[in-house]
């Protein structure tokens, strides 16, 4: 992309925002073309530096690249098992969506009662955005609980 924005996770809870641009786009910008509410203060900058340090030290992105295909595989297994309830599974990395034929809110509510927090996106899509440190066992537990709901 020509411009990429990031916030929220960038400071791991400390309000901060940032954007990166290609050289061509950056060269076309002048001072004052872009303003920021959460950029550049010393606390936020220190938080971002620490987050980057931890990401590198703990190989967070390597872990995400290993675990994301597993999440996709497990969600698609559910789709194959319940084709009358799950219309589609799509997404990239650890940001996945499951489109249902029914109401996503019903499944989200039932999952909360089972101890798993999910969110819906619209009326028929469950959004999956686990923490970047999610493990296979967490995905398995979530999928087992989804299977209980879809199989009921």
List where the protein language model places each region.
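Conserved N-terminal phosphate-binding loop of PLP-dependent enzymes in the Aspartate aminotransferase
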Residues: 1-152
